[in-house]
Structures are given as C-alpha cells and as structure tokens.
Amino acid sequence: MSTLYRAVERGVYIVPGSPITMIIKCSDANWVVDPGLLTNRRDLLRSALERLSVEKYNVLLSHTHYDHLEALEALTSSRIYVTVLEYTSLLSSLVRNIVTYGFTQLLRILGVRSIDVKKEMVEIVDEGFKLGDSCGELLNLSGHSPGLTGIVFEDAVFVGDAVFGEKLLSRVGIPYHFNARQALSTLEKIKAYAEKGYSGILSHGPFANSDKLAEYVDLNAERLKLIRELVIDHLTQEPLSLEELVGKILGELRAEINAGNILLGSVTVNSIISDLLEEYGLSTEVSGGLVRYRLTRK
C-alpha cells in the first residue's frame, strides 16, 4: 500500500495529515478536497497526484480556514469550488480572518499567511451538488464555519471539521466552532449517518468505522455540552472577562492554557454566551481594564 495515500472507498483516497487531503477520481472529473498546509503538502500532493495518474482536477474546499487552503498555491487546479457562505472568505483574506478570528492579531500568533483567490477561478456550490456520476454529494455541515460542507459517498461520509478526533480535542480543550448550537445540530445529522452504517472521514482524526464515528460524534457533543455547563456555572457565580472564562474552562478540561487555545476557544465560548441570552440576562462591569460578564436568571 502506498505511504502517500490510503484508499477508503472506490475512487476516494486520503493523503494523511491534519487536516487530511482527499483525492477523488470520478468518471467525468477529478477532485482535490482541502489541499491543507503548504509546509507539508507541496511535494506530497504532487507525488500523490502523479502516482494516481491525476493530471486535471478541480479543488473543493470544505471551508476556508487557512489550514485547509494554504497549499492551494502548490496546485494547478482547473477551478476552485466552495459553498456560498464561504465564498467571500475565499476571495479576501481580510474577510476570512475577521469572520474566523474576529480580528487580525491572531494571524501572527498562529503563523497564518494571507491568501487571496481571484474570483474568476471560483465556482459556488451548495448542498446536493454532485461531484460526478455516483461520486459523492455535498452535505451541509455548518457550525464549525458558516458554510462547512461534507461529502456523502456510497459507504462513507466526509465530515470535515464538524467532528474532531480525541487527540485534537485533548490538545485544544475547546473545539473551535463559529456557531456552537449549529455545530450540535450538525453532529446529530452526522450521528444519523453513523447509525445507517456509514464510515467517517475526519479532517483532524483517523478514518472511523460507523461505530467509531458514532463514538466521536458523542465525544464532540458531550464536550460542547460540558463547555456550556461550565460557562453557566462560572458566569452565574462571578463576573469574568471572556479570556478569563476561557482560561478557567481550559484548566478544568486539562488542556494547555496558551494564546492560541484561549483566542480560538473564545470564539466558541462567545457563541455559547450569545445563545444563553435566550434564557439568561447578561450584565457587564469594567474593572482592571477588562470588560467582565455575568449571567443572571430571568
């Protein structure tokens, strides 16, 4: 078996990494899904494509986070396909960074490069779009990002960043989700596929049979629900700034408390706080140069 890639279904190949890259060979089109990071993909993808005799191909981006698209410049694709809610973020790194992180300082901390794509190269697709005849169909998995897309194959489902493996969850503590409530709904959708016997292809995690996919879905759902409970517990007891709150939660989850985990985790926690405003009141106070939040029962 090639060390460059692994066949997981007829015409579907995984190039290992975090995130993984998929190469899909259809009768009428070839696809590279999520080129990944440039540092470990430039030569690897070219070698895999050559080994698989793939000369012409399109690129499909599950979403536009930098770790999934940075290696675009190493490829010579015909077109780049993306969902409508990810379109502007693909064209503009400024929009991408504001939508993803809320500001731009985090880019230097994470070592993110600014990549802009010309609109003439881009095609907009939506849920139900078929990659080819019996070759996979797009599935809306929004939550991690506004327009995250998965792919349903004959016996497997590509879940992108909607489901994370144990190692990543252990490392980051708080999984990044633009909309935590929507992410939970998406997990329920994926669980239904697992219960039908579909295997799971995770961007950041191992290939999973249906039973293991169901376990991963439950693990991710339980983590989001636990974080919600911790947000309520802390903010009903004392006022905290967003970063103070995230730091406390990371400590309780036994994850590393570093700048990246705090800043990325803040997006998820802020989303949870916004949802809680349907059930709780929110008060603010300023002390020590920080805006601190407190939840009060209505």
Residue ranges and their predicted role:
Residues N30, V59, R79, A156-V157, ...:
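Hydrophobic "anchor" residues on beta-strands that sit immediately upstream
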Residues D211-E238, V291:
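Short alpha-helical segments that sit at the start of domains
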Residues L37-L131:
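Active-site HxH/HxHxD metal-binding segment of metal-dependent hydrolases
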Residues G11, I24, D34, H63, ...:
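Divalent metal-coordination and catalytic microenvironments
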Residues I14-V15, K25, S47-E55, A71-S77, ...:
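Alpha-helix C-terminal capping segments
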Residues S2-E50, T149-G165:
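Conserved beta-strand hairpin/beta-sheet module of binuclear metal-dependent hydrolase folds
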Residues L37-T39, E137-S142, P146-Y216, E222:
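Metallo-beta-lactamase
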Residues L230-K298:
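C-terminal regulatory/interaction regions
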